[in-house]
Amino acid sequence: MPQIKDNGADVISRYCPIKLYFWDITESAEQLLGMLPSSYAYHEEVAARFRSEARRKEWLAVRVLLHRVADISEPIAYKESGGPYFVHTPSSVSISHTSHFACLALGNAPFGVDIEQYGAKALALTDKFLKPQEKELVSQTSIAPEQFAVLAWSAKEAVYKAADDVSLGLFQDITIEHVDEPKALLSVRVQHQSDCGVGEVWKVSYVFMPHFVLTLCFKDGERIVRESL
């Protein structure tokens, strides 16, 4: 199914200068393979990487967005950390999947994107990824607890991707400190294991889209947000 259009992407791009592409996955893996250039051995690669049909479709949908919508011919490579990158194309890339949706994001600086489908699972697991003071933030907003839990989980995933540091823990090292609802921004403190001080505060933009929440974090997000206002 073609790229999803939503004003939410326009809102978030005011703060983070990137290109966002979405795909509502209604096709089979074979149909998605048929949309990809034959010059790449995607059929063999996806068969070797994934047994699950759902995971195959998520992976292939991102490649369809890359080649058919973003019009980039270069395949995505992966670092040892698991983060995606291009060898030759001068763009940073981040990807995410949730349920039957896929997201591809392209920018000119390191960043992380995440999408998370709405549901009760995140709320049931808050003790695993939110500190007590983070849970208290929901009472200072108009966001419903279940929706806030999904937002918090997604925001921490976006920060983790932007940091590209496998030693970071979502609970211990990434802490949401403030929610600015009018600007749809979160202030998140990141404490690397190598830090001797109090860490850094990064900005995470968010938007509640019809089927999922979208979050986006730049490593230099505070400067980017400040200069975009």
Language model regions located:
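Core catalytic alpha/beta fold that binds nucleotide/phospho-ligands
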Residues: 1-229
